[in-house]
Amino acid sequence: MLYPAELRYSKSHEWVKVEDGVTVVGISDFAQNALGDVVFVNLPAEGDSVTAGDAFGDVESVKAVSDLVSPVTGTVCAVNEDLLDAPETLNSDPYGAWIIKVENVEDSEELLDAAAYEAFCSEEG
């Protein structure tokens, strides 16, 4: 499993990176591995509000449908529409295939650094 040190992680297995004041959100390597082959992604629209700890979309894999949980509260300013045509990118490049970008961030869940997230994942098995 990969745990890039420059990212922060939620306990629901989303990663977070801040670029030029915008929060970028994706799913972790641990999440994509647990999901199996991703076949569909349901995304919010630009301008939608997201709330830390609440679902903002879902990912359908060959195993199950799983909620995407927002690690931050704010407004969606960009959606990775490439995932609609190529959802499997979440498997092949989980840290390159961002899902949404959020601006006007007001709040966030408790985010873990890479070492703490790796320890959390090893406890989850």
Regions found by a protein language model. Name each.
Residues 1-55, 92-125:
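Acidic, low-complexity mobile loops and tails
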Residues 12-14, 79-87, 93:
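Basic/aromatic-rich interaction segments and small domains that mediate binding to polyanionic partners
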Residues 18-21, 65, 78-85, 107-109:
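Short, conserved beta-turn/loop elements at beta-strand boundaries and strand-helix junctions
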Residues 49, 67, 73-75:
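Beta-solenoid/beta-rich acyl/carboxylate-transfer cores
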Residues 61-64, 72:
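Periplasm/extracytoplasmic soluble domains of Gram-negative envelope assemblies
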Residues 70, 88, 112:
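Histidine-anchored, small-residue-rich loop motif
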